[in-house]
Amino acid sequence: MSNIEKQAGELQEKLIAVNRVSKTVKGGRIMSFTALTVVGDGNGRVGFGYGKAREVPAAIQKAMEKARRNMINVALNEGTLQHPVKGSHTGSRVFMQPASEGTGIIAGGAMRAVLEVAGVHNVLSKAYGSTNPINVVRATIDALANMKSPEMVAAKRGKTVEEIWG
């Protein structure tokens, strides 16, 4: 949690991965850097960004800007998920389920960073297939975006929450 930066406007920013990439041209190789970041308000809003530049700080800055631009709202239930959810992107598949208070974030690598900045405090999760950070982040955000609160389901069906709970 120490490498999460608090920003003005209460956004938490987290750097997930920096990678050196190269383009081979006639005269040799052109090196550049890519950065993967996630941004969240710790209260159900989260977004990720992927930036590329000749220098690391510029790549990180581009990634942060992109992350702020494409944030989504996540319907959380008192610091955990509403229901078990699955998400996938290319070769990565993730499964997450709600956990009781005091469990903590049981998640690895890139998935943990997304859940921390989104404001999830208790969750059980597992990543299957590819553990490429970009794909895991996309799969995690896909799963969080597919999660529906009882209020959302009730509104979609044109019923009250009590009718849905049975």
Swiss-Prot record:
Chain ranges of the S5 DRBM domain: 11-74
Keyword Isomerase: no
Lineage: Bacteria, Pseudomonadati, Pseudomonadota, Gammaproteobacteria, Pasteurellales
Pfam families, alphabetized: Ribosomal_S5, Ribosomal_S5_C
Swiss-Prot/TrEMBL GO biological process terms: translation
Keyword Ribosomal protein: yes
Single GO cellular component term: small ribosomal subunit
Subunit structure: Part of the 30S ribosomal subunit. Contacts proteins S4 and S8.
Free-text comment on this protein's domains from its UniProt entry: The N-terminal domain interacts with the head of the 30S subunit; the C-terminal domain interacts with the body and contacts protein S4. The interaction surface between S4 and S5 is involved in control of translational fidelity.
Name of this protein: Small ribosomal subunit protein uS5
Described purpose of this protein according to its UniProt entry: With S4 and S12 plays an important role in translational accuracy. Located at the back of the 30S subunit body where it stabilizes the conformation of the head with respect to the body.
TM stretches of this protein: none
